[in-house]
Each structure stands twice: as C-alpha cells, then as structure tokens.
C-alpha cells in the first residue's frame, strides 16, 4: 500500500474512510453550507452537479494520484459523512478539517484529528502543520487540543475568494525536533509576524 493511499481508520465513535460517489448527497450537504465553508478556500457548492465536480477535483483526483489523505468523517452508527479531515502529501503535511454545523461542539474534529495524527506518526512523518484564519479562533482551539503549537502568522491574498486573510500556522513535531518550524508561508509572505499573546 502506498503511503498516500487514504486508509480506513476507526476511533471510539468514528469511521474515517475515503469518500465515494455514493456519498454525493453528503458531499453536497457539507460543502453547500455557507457557514461551514466561510473560512475555506472555495465557494459553497450550489447544485448536485457542482458537488460532483467538487468531489472529482478535490477527492477522486487525490485518491487516484495518491497525493493526500482525504477522509470522510462518519459516525460508526450510520456510516454517513458528516465532515472531512485531510492531510496533504506535500512538504507542509497540512492537516485540514470541517464538519456540518449540527456536529460542532462534540469533539468530533479533535477525535478525527487524533486518529490521523496517530496514523501519520506510524507512517514516519516528522511533523504536521495546520493553518486557520485569525477570524476563526474555534479552529485554532482544535489545533491546540491536538497538541499543536502556534508558530507564526502571515497574510495571504486568498484565492479564489481574492480577499486578504491573516492565517496562524500551528505545528506538531512527531519526531521530537521541536526547534524546527515550517517556514514556507513565512518566507513567501511579505506580511508575517508572531503574535506574542498566543505563545
């Protein structure tokens, strides 16, 4: 099995697995909600056809190319996706997640993230990063609960929404090398700084 084949993972409450075309109604429900997608780098889908295109471009292609882990987050009791958690295969090893609103505040993103982190450690990844919009501190609290630490903030002109966004980068070192910081976003951004009150 290739390192970047999305595996199936289980936790106490959750089943993490690849999305399939049978999940398109759930894909639509997750990615059509404006509030769920408010801080994400895409516009909400408006039709089932857009949901299918979104699935093909962002999920099926990653499964085919083995370029990232892209999990559907499902409750074990019904195996219906209520969100997603991803880990990129590039050098950022970026962790991302999102949930339908009715599943917020239940610790599900943290539980799913912990499972992905365990799998990443077993696979030998040295570190993971994650970023969140400064206007979305809820996501930063998930990162902190996952054991990640804040490293720096940077500004990016976010596409396709074409808006300036301040992001905070968090990092988790899985190999014990805590002095290392993933610097790509810092180096690429003309506006970067450390928010002392977060450290």
Task: Mark where each language-model region is.
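Acyl-donor (CoA/ACP) binding surface of acyl/acetyltransferases
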Residues: 1-38, 70-199
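Conserved GNAT-fold acetyl-CoA-binding loop/helix
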Residues: 35-57
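A short helix-loop-beta-strand connector motif used in the catalytic cores of GNAT acetyltransferases and
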Residues: 58-72
